[in-house]
Amino acid sequence: MSPKITHVNPETLHKNPAFSQAVLVEGGKTLYIGGQNGVLADGSLAGPDFATQTEQIYRNLLKILHSVGASQKNLVKQTIFVVKGQNLQAGLAAAQKVWGPFPAAISVVFVEGLGQPGRGVLIEVDAIAVVDA
């Protein structure tokens, strides 16, 4: 059974094409995606800058989703951890180049650092998707 995913954006709340205020899911299985960094298949960082790392994260998310027969439309929630000092708007623009117009519910958290100190990791994204049952 294919899940029914409805993006909820009440008229009385702010609208933004980059995210939904809430996502209602009926049916399907839940896929929990652990924190993704902007790394290549060999584990090296895709680049030292925020935009390059962000683009790679969304490429990696697509690979994970495709591996279970899903796509961007199945992603319902993202938590985005950004190292303080990064330009969030530049990161969101970089993500959209890879991801397109699929607005999951999101939370953004600015942090002092991420789980790989000294490596130069500037962003991490974990996510939840709903896939066919």
Stretches found by the model and what they are:
Residues 1-59, 63-76, 82-133:
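N-terminal presequence-like segments and the immediate start of the first folded domain
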